[in-house]
Amino acid sequence: MTAKGAFDRFLAFARRWTKRIDDAPEALHAWLGRERAAWKEKGWRGVVTPPRVTGAILTLLLVGSASFWWVTRPPALPDYAAVRAGWHPSEAWLYDRHGVLIDSSRIDYQARRLAWTKLQDVSPVARDIVIAAEDRRFREHGGVDWMALTGAARDRLEGKRGRGASTLSMQVAAYLAPDLANPGSRGVRDKLRQMRAAWALESRWSKDQILEAYLNLAGFRGEAQGIGAAALGLFGKTPATLTRDDALLLAALLPNPQAAPGEVARRACALSRDKDCSRFAGDAASMLGPARSLALDPGLAPHLSAALLTRPGARITTTLDASIQRAAITALKRQLQGLGGSRARDGAVIVVDNQSGDVLAYVGGIGGESTAPAVDGAASYRQAGSTLKPFLYAMGIEKGYLTAASILDDSPVQLDTASGLYVPQNYDKAFKGPVSARIALAGSLNVPAVRTLLLTGVDAFRDRLWDTGYRGLVEDGQYYGYSLALGSAEVTLMEQVDAYRSLALEGRWSPLRLTMDAKTEAPRRTTTPQAAWIVADMLADPNARAGTFGVDSALRLPFWAAVKTGTSKAMRDNWCVGFTDRFTVGVWVGNLEGDPMRAVSGTSGAAPVWRDVMLALNEANPGRAPPRPEGIEERQIRFAAGIEQPRREYFLKGTGLDRIAYAPPEARRPRIVNPVGGSVYALDPDIPRDNQRLAISVSGQALGHRLILDKRDLGTADSRPLILAPPGKHRLALVDLDGKTVDQVLFTIR
């Protein structure tokens, strides 16, 4: 059949049915007349319905029923298991190692939801009151309360204020299918869709499942969704501990979650049917007062929660101890308040268990007067100050360059560097002359530290720091220069604490743990047990630090503890990091925006916090000195020319001396002083090239050593030759009698 033929047949069909429709009123009228006459004559026996009319009526009924069924069809609803599985709290929670809630973080901002509350975790009185208030025949009907529906219809016809007829099942269906509860969805069709959805829900869910879902999905106040969030936010309770009055007030919120306290009190009174309802007015005002917050977590570790809590509903158990966390917060807050006039606004505290590496306290800041309260002070990179010196001296002792009794000259020194002349000074701008390494480290003297760095080498020391967990040192040693000994590099408090912990563990380093499920990595050795032990003993010596800090500073504790302070340039940062046999504690005080403090050093800023935390940690079991490892000998020593008082000192076996007069030979090993590594020298175009020379200078005992320039032997190092090198990059090496390179520099001539 052609397309035209099909179209013609369709038109003929349409005309026939159009005529039948047009004739229908007259035919129907005639039929009704005949039926009426038959009824008058014979009653029901005389009524005869023509088959065609009967078919039409049945057709109309079927079409109408199908249309009704279609337009009132409910949306597809998930089953109970799917709703439970798809439930995501708006929060994530942080717990300490003992299961105590220490913080939470808001992840989802659409609503405030807690974890799904099981029906058995809601107090029985609260369950009964919610049913009585919202659907008192809930246990009896099959999804639609016909009595309530009839009453609501009668009230509407009589012009009365309509009562609610939506059952719990209908409300749950509306929560699961939001289009059932759209604004304006109050027509007959919408109500019928809700009814059919409720029937479908009742056919697949149990009554307890429907009630449980309602208690979790219902909105109570503001953005609080579910009885868990409402109980915690409005009463500070769990659903299991809700009393009768609590439940009455919560049920009074359900019809209008934003109702004023007076309206809530009146509705609670009506639900209670008590004669004396005066208590509800005050309870409602207190419950809904502006001071009530929906976030009642302790808020003990906001910076750590911001870092760890990224997934809604997450429950992370940290290594923290809530009691130690509180003690650290209290100590830091008290100190910052005391420094109010010194422009010190920020601080951070880390406490670590030495053996496990578990972080027991993590305080990234306390807010207060901070201008950057969201910034984590424990993870921020700041200048280290003098806190890197212990690792420098440990390296010197380990390599045999010096001992704890070696004499270092604390006197003015000028060092040529690629960026100019470097002149280190002490904190108090004074110099003490010859001092032992013990006094120099414990007293945090700067010039002796720089002289020690000359022994170890900048690159080697930078590499040692990197191995000890200081991951912010991404440049080579030449970038930091001699100031690396004095803490020009930037470090974090977490890195500091972990590095000092390695000294407490005899030179073994491993990453710290923040969560209980984190893997424990095997430690690696960064220095020898002997060097670590000797440095720890130097840091724990109150007599050695007395010349700089006094005999009764904040660093002195009634038990054994090794400690070091540090202050960065212009007093922008100060540190105090130390350890006992069981704990390592680190404190940073400063300003996260980088502006300087006013006359605040490590001993006056960070040290009091460190002391308070250490006293709290060691109250029951005071810190004890670690046992001396093998390979260390103790000797009675005396110093020449009365440099220091006689004392007993510790040495690596084979390095001990009875009388200390000069630094050991290793401390005077030769170094290339000029040219300076990394320097760029330019030829003067106005001076004949043959007349331009570059002087070489070597310090220390260089007898028998030779200089090698780009594999060319320049002769013995004591000749101080002048060289003319062509433009380009050059390598100058100093080698000993065995041909071993003891020092080298790279420089450029243009």
Please place each PLM-identified region on the residue numbering.
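Conserved catalytic neighborhood of penicillin-recognizing serine enzymes
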Residues: 155-182, 355, 402-461, 505, ...
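Non-catalytic, structured segments within soluble enzyme domains
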Residues: 64-68, 161, 165-326, 330, ...
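Active-site loop and adjoining helix of the penicillin-binding protein/serine DD-peptidase-beta-lactamase fold
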Residues: 198, 202, 254-271, 312-324, ...
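Soluble, non-transmembrane domains of envelope/secretory-pathway proteins that act on or interact
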Residues: 2, 35-36, 42-44, 51, ...
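Flexible, acidic/glycine-enriched loop-and-adjacent beta/alpha segments
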Residues: 86-87, 118-168, 225-235, 242-247
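N-terminal type II signal-anchor transmembrane helix
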Residues: 2-95, 280
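A short, well-structured edge-of-sheet supersecondary motif
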Residues: 91-103, 122, 342-371, 463-468
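A penicillin-recognizing enzyme superfamily signal
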Residues: 318-341, 349-353, 362-365, 369-383, ...
